[in-house]
Amino acid sequence: MQFRMTLISVLAVAVMAACGGKAKTDTGGGGGDSGATLYDRLGKKDAITAVVKDFVEERVAKDDRIKSFFLNTDIPNLEAKLVDQICQVAKGPCTYTGKDMKTAHAGMNIKDADFNALVEDLKASLDHFKVGDKEQKELIGALATMHDDIVTAK
C-alpha cells in the first residue's frame, strides 16, 4: 500500500501540528511576533524537514499500529511531499504538488484508529522538537480538515 503522504500529514493534517519546531531550538509555544506566519514560527523549511524525518522514520515506521501502511512507500518521496504540504498549509513558500488526500488514500481502508495513531506519532515528534502548543494547535487545526478524505473505513 502506498500510504503516501498524509495519513500524515495528518497530519500533516491532523495536524499535526507538525512540523514545527526548530530542529535546534525551542519554539517556546508563543511565537512572539504576532505578524509572523506559522511557517516562520515553526522554524521554516529546515525545521519542518527535521520534524517530518523524525515523524516518518522514528515514529511511524516503528509504530506497529500503522507501519504496515507504509511498507511499499517511497519514503524519501513521502517525506518531501509532507514537508511541502506542511510548508504550504503553514503559509510558507512551498507548493504541494502531490495527489489530493482522497485520491492518495483511496482503497486503503484507513480507520479513525489508524488516523489517530498517526496524529499521536506526529504529536510526539513535535514535542520532541519542543514545538509550542500554539503552533501545534494551529497546524493541527489546518491539517484536520483532511480527515474525511483520508479516513474512509468504519
Q: Locations of the language-model features?
A:
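Repetitive helical segments and hydrophobic/amphipathic motifs
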Residues: 11-13
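Heme-based O2/NO sensor domains and their adjacent alpha-helical segments
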Residues: 30-36, 49-127, 133, 139-140, ...
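Short, low-complexity N-terminal intrinsically disordered segments enriched in polar/charged residues
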Residues: 26-44
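C-terminal motif of bacterial Sec signal peptides marking the signal peptidase cleavage site
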Residues: 15-18
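Bacterial N-terminal signal peptides that target proteins for export
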Residues: 1-8
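Bacterial signal peptide processing site
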Residues: 20-23
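Short terminal or interdomain "cap/linker" segment that borders an active site or interface and mediates
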Residues: 144-154
